[in-house]
Regions:
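Conserved structural position within tetratricopeptide repeats
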Residues: 2-6, 35-39, 76, 83-84, ...
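Residue-level recognition of tetratricopeptide repeat
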Residues: 10, 44, 89, 122-123
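Structural motif corresponding to the intra-repeat A-B loop/turn of tetratricopeptide repeats
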Residues: 24, 58-61, 103
């Protein structure tokens, strides 16, 4: 399919376009749209969050960790309002925890798992992550 090139500076257009590409499994195009959203609104977490998802979908085994910098930015932008962004913070830290687990850095993985447990003490992914050697 052809890439749509909006001439607008309206971030909402790039958000909606990125979502359309994402749900159509066109992850590279989604990433490009969310990149433009970040360019227009760098202080908003949502562009980084969806860019992280688009990159995670391109690296399903998390071998390359291409979503990591975007999930880290989500954590940075959302941590001050943890209750409001609980779902986003949990998803972001789950990715980070898993990334460090498969890359054999238990100390960094455990930091991510513990951040999740502060928001959701019964989170099974985090509890299981902490049990891993």
């Amino acid at each position: 399919s052809k890439q749509i090139r909006p001439t607008t500076k309206d971030p909402k257009v790039f958000y909606e376009l990125g979502q359309a590409y994402y749900y159509n499994k066109e992850y590279v195009k989604a990433d490009s749209s969310f990149s433009k959203l970040i360019e227009l609104k760098p202080s908003l977490y949502i562009g980084y969050f969806w860019r992280a998802r688009a990159n995670a979908a391109q690296d399903p085994e998390t071998k390359l960790g291409i979503a990591k910098p975007y999930y880290e930015k989500v954590i940075e932008l959302c941590s001050a309002n943890g209750e409001k962004y609980e779902d986003e913070l949990i998803e972001s830290n789950e990715y980070i925890g898993y990334y460090y687990t498969i890359h054999r850095d238990k100390a960094k993985a455990d930091v991510a798992w513990n951040k999740i447990l502060k928001l959701d003490p019964k989170n099974t992914k985090a509890l299981n992550g902490l049990k891993m050697k």
